């Protein structure tokens, strides 16, 4: 990130993504998963019982299991996970576009931490920090970003002003960007697919029952993009699903795996997009692009094509710029 004189640059924008291990070894993965899965916003369970299950069962098994999956998607050229690589580049591009603001990024879990970046921004003279969670749909992962921000602030004698960017699941710039992304992908294909499947990260159904708006936000994103596209593509079915189920509880349905198996049995061709993810990560590059694709083809599916996340594309930079400008009226 660029360094700025504290005399002239007092406002900062902090992009926050979910997080990633520092490397794909057992120790790094276990450390990351422990921080992530210890957050009561993420796992709502008896804290004592969950701590025992997490440390004795979940972490030893999942850390070893995930070595191969992380290694498969790891950006070995830069020795970074794709999520970290794209988020870092995204922040750098937005920083260059916003001359009057300091732009940086942090991860809610893992490194670079929110705490380290708030300190860095203060050292550069930021007296106002705009927090921008890169999750279009609001859920526990959004709330916990602010939990951590205010935990950090509670320890500071000098606290910067904090502002937050709202979830952008139905923002016109977001809907237009996702719609255009799908159009551009469809133009590259040799034939028109039978279905475009919108796959969002899943959530235990009980969270929805308790009032979490995530499902409603996902559905609205899906509906608004569908409305943008269905007149132009009347022969394509647009459908919604949820992936990455974890544990024995019932999660939001329909499950992506189940929907893809249904399409495979019907020998359909499918294009899949994961608009809840701002950058490609394990859930898109391994779970969807490899595991789900292999299962889909094995079960009789015709063609499978995954649309990349917005990542560090210029379209993503422009979209974030417009959303921020709409929310806070950027200084030009």
Swiss-Prot record:
Cell compartments where the protein resides: Cytoplasm
Residue runs in coiled coils: none
UniProt enzyme class: lyase
Cytoplasm listed as a keyword: yes
Chief place where the protein resides: cytoplasm
Listed GO CC annotations: cytoplasm
GO molecular function: ferrochelatase activity; metal ion binding
Domain of life of the source: Bacteria
Pathway this chain belongs to: Porphyrin-containing compound metabolism; protoheme biosynthesis; protoheme from protoporphyrin-IX: step 1/1
Reactions this protein catalyses: heme b + 2 H(+) = protoporphyrin IX + Fe(2+)
Keyword Iron: yes
GO biological process, one term: heme biosynthetic process
Keyword terms, alphabetized: Cytoplasm, Heme biosynthesis, Iron, Lyase, Metal-binding, Porphyrin biosynthesis
EC numbers: 4.98.1.1
CDD domains per the UniProt record, alphabetical: Ferrochelatase_C (cd00419), Ferrochelatase_N (cd03411)
InterPro entries: Ferrochelatase, Ferrochelatase_AS, Ferrochelatase_C, Ferrochelatase_N
Function: Catalyzes the ferrous insertion into protoporphyrin IX.
Similarity comment: Belongs to the ferrochelatase family.
Protein name as catalogued: Ferrochelatase
């Amino acid at each position: 990130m660029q360094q700025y004189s504290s005399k002239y640059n007092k406002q900062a924008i902090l992009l926050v993504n979910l997080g990633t291990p520092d490397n794909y070894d057992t120790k790094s993965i276990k450390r990351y998963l422990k921080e992530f899965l210890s957050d009561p916003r993420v796992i709502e369970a008896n804290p004592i019982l969950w701590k025992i299950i997490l440390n004795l069962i979940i972490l030893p098994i999942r850390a070893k299991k995930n070595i191969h999956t992380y290694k498969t998607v790891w950006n070995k050229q830069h020795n970074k996970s794709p999520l970290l690589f794209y988020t870092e580049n995204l922040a750098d591009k937005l920083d260059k576009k916003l001359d009057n603001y300091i732009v940086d990024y942090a991860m809610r879990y893992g490194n670079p931490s929110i705490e380290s970046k708030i300190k860095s921004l203060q050292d550069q003279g930021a007296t106002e920090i705009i927090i921008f969670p890169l999750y279009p749909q609001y859920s526990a992962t959004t709330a916990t970003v602010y939990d951590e921000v205010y935990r950090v602030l509670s320890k500071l004698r000098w606290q910067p002003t904090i502002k937050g960017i709202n979830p952008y699941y139905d923002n016109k710039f977001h809907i237009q960007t996702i719609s255009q992304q799908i159009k551009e992908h469809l133009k590259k294909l040799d034939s028109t697919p039978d279905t475009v499947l919108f796959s969002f990260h899943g959530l235990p159904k009980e969270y929805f029952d308790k009032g979490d708006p995530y499902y409603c936000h996902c559905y609205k994103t899906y509906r608004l993009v569908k409305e943008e596209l269905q007149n132009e593509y009347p022969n394509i079915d647009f459908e919604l699903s949820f992936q990455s189920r974890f544990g024995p509880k019932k999660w939001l349905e329909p499950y992506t795996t189940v929907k893809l198996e249904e399409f495979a049995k019907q020998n359909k061709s499918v294009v899949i997009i994961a608009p809840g993810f701002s950058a490609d990560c394990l859930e898109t590059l391994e779970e969807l692009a490899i595991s789900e694709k292999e299962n889909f083809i094995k079960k009789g599916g015709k063609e499978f094509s995954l649309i990349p996340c917005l990542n560090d594309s210029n379209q993503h930079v422009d979209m974030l710029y417009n959303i921020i400008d709409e929310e806070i009226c950027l200084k030009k």
